UniProtKB/Swiss-Prot annotation:
The keyword Membrane appears for this protein: no
GO cellular component, one term: cytoplasm
CDD domains: PBP2_HemC_archaea
Additional information: The porphobilinogen subunits are added to the dipyrromethane group.
Protein name: Probable porphobilinogen deaminase
Cofactor binding annotation: Binds 1 dipyrromethane group covalently.
Modified residues (S-(dipyrrolylmethanemethyl)cysteine): 237
A molecular function (GO) term: hydroxymethylbilane synthase activity
Function: Tetrapolymerization of the monopyrrole PBG into the hydroxymethylbilane pre-uroporphyrinogen in several discrete steps.
Amino acid sequence: MKYIVGARGSQLSVAQTNLVIAELKKAHPDTEYEIKTITTKGDTDSRPLFTIDQKGIFEKEIDRAVAQKEVDFAVHSLKDVPSELDDNLVLACIPKRETVNDVFISPDGSTLDSIKPGSVIGTSSLRRAVQVSRKRPDVTVKPIRGNIETRIKKASGENYDAIVLAKAGISRLGVDVKYTELSTDDFSPSPGQGAIAIVARADDSKTIEMLKKIEDPDSRLEIEAERALSDFVDSGCRFPVGAYAKSNGSEMTLTVTAFSVDGKQFLHVSKTGDKNNPKSLGQSAGEELREKGVNDLALNWREKVEEWNKT
């Protein structure tokens, strides 16, 4: 039996797809897998991500290939996958999640705390940008695009003194670079950060059963809580909300942070509940955020992004 696997052509996407295949081969040693790389809108549009008013820019073309039976299943970074898929597709598998932390990379070994005032920090994420500005208001934060290795090289160039990105990407690529891990207390991660999503056709029970061999139940439940929260407040690239769920026995704690554009205002919610009811936990955290005024922050962000788009 041979499966065709859809993925982006980026180094990270291919690397994490190969990691998935390696795990599948442990469970199904006689099965073959072939990667088919597919170009997405996110690969060809060089604008900062927060200015693109469209969800699924890194996965839509690949999932279309799944739906049209050009590939059997697709491997994505879960944070790039919209919570609502086409009716004929399903989030078939979430393998064990990597670390959710962000990291700070500077050529001279500086940390975020020690880097000199006036330094330029690059990031592709509004969420990271506002948290850098909140912790170090004396530095400049600029958008940065490109794959991970390109961004690391840019940190040594004329335009950037350091970058902030997800630790999971560095780990999966095996990049040899020194970094400082940032605490989730200071840098609340994106909902779904560090997780991989595998999408298949809803009616392809054989493929779904095969993929379930590498499913991690706790990772699935934690992701469901984070995405339920994200859906409730309608967060995304254009409105940064950090969310991190962690299981502990029969319980799960969901910690959420939302910021104003300038980082001076922030809302913080931490809720603990039954880990087997993650969507309820996410909605409960969302309701508390709403009571604390998250809708005002969201409007603040939408107005600012529209202003940026006009410049």
